[in-house]
Amino acid sequence: LLPVLVLSILIYKILHKNWRHSHWEVDIIAEKTGTLHFVEVKTRRTKKFGHPEENVNKKKIQNLINAADEYLYQQPQWKKIQFNILSITILKNKPIEYFFIEDVYL
């Protein structure tokens, strides 16, 4: 729910949450100003293992691309797309931190 709230504040229209096809998944598919956004969300409750966005590895990126390809096959009307990462850190007794990386080059 928190990722949807963050994106809503940033004026994104949420189209799908946890969209799946076969074994691929996109955490959030959203639209903003005519562009379709595929958003990978990473959340952590500790900084022990680094920042959440650092856990978006090559395999995850490839799965996101494959899922996006399938989505676009099913919804061919979209001409402009973008990949984003939403990183959320929730630490005890601290304000929630989020870091939104737009237009990630894959």
What are these regions (language model features)?
Residues Y73-L106:
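Domain-level recognition of nuclease-like catalytic cores that cleave nucleotide substrates
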Residues V26-K47, V56, L64:
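Conserved catalytic cores of phosphodiester-cleaving nucleases, focusing on short active-site segments
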Residues K13, L36, K80:
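Hydrophobic "anchor" residues on beta-strands that sit immediately upstream
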Residues K48-K79:
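Mid-chain, well-packed structural core segment of small domains
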Residues W24, T35-H37, N84, F99:
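Protein kinase-like catalytic core scaffold
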Residues L1-K17:
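Acidic-basic catalytic patches of nuclease active cores, encompassing PD-(D/E)XK
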Residues H21-W24, K94:
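Short acidic/glycine-enriched loop/turn segments that link adjacent beta-strands
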Residues H16-R20, L86-T89:
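Short, solvent-exposed loop/turn elements at beta->coil junctions and helix N-caps
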